[in-house]
Amino acid sequence: MACGEVVVEGRSVPRVANPRDTESALNWQLERIGSAAWLDWPLKFQRMAFGYANDSGWHDAADAVSWLDHHKLLREGQAPRGALVWYHAGDRIRVACSLGSGQVVGPLLTGPVEVALLISLSTDYVWSDPHFPFGH
């Protein structure tokens, strides 16, 4: 497999840039601070932040983590700015976007879009690049 490609269902798919770059995606999210419209839609929120209007191809964050893990795209340690942070919250996996310095943004457990310290949400997390292989 050549660098910059992802294998999907036995075929190689070239990686493409997201429609929105990292800073634009973060700005999109920060403009929505306080909005409760995204309650229980953290994956959809992140997909839309990075510029994809249509479905990600994943049922939920747990499905995404399973796919990313299978393709060895998950990382441990401090997430860089713009990375997707996948964390356990209660009985399910959630996703937020790293602002760097241990902070994340997204629709958090309490509902509205917020900025929070990751450590206050969970100590069980991994991160990935903002990659939506099925997004369009």
Language-model regions: role of each:
Residues 9-15, 26-34, 98-136:
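Aromatic- and glycine-rich peptidoglycan recognition patches
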Residues 1-90:
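Secreted/periplasmic proteins that engage bacterial cell-wall peptidoglycan
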Residues 82-87, 95-98, 104-106:
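Structural recognition of the beta-strand scaffold that forms the well-ordered cores
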Residues 58-67, 92, 97-98, 111, ...:
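Generic detector of ordered, mature protein regions
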